[in-house]
Amino acid sequence: MNPRLFPWLLGLPLMLSVPATAGVVINEIFYHAPDSMDDLQWIELHNPDPQPADISGWRLTRGVEFQFPANSVLPSGGFVVLSKDPKLFAEFYEARVGGQFKKSLGRSGDTVELVDGAGRSVDRVTYGEGDPWPASADGV
């Protein structure tokens, strides 16, 4: 046996036994609605994995606050929309709202983080008005 490979081979069974984190991502953010509809803000999550993702106890933190209740499952290829004001959202979109978040997304920039039930970061998005965000993202 090659002695340089030995440390890697010892760690191999451990690495193979660690389950992969679900691939749920923050897919889309609508943070800057017209002034008269500031509560139209929403966040879309997507599960691109071939398996459903149990997102029970997962939270959105930093810019907004939301926690998924027990028995929350995002199907394979599925989407869920969370909004600041589900009633206002329903006036403009046909999609069903999966929950209402607290606080507001910053109009000129913010960070949104998705953490699992153990507090581990699953995905994080930071946005703002500068590059690489196009000016048209602000409705200009």
Annotate each PLM feature.
Residues 7-17:
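Bacterial N-terminal signal peptides
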Residues 1-5:
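Positively charged n-region of N-terminal signal peptides that target proteins for export
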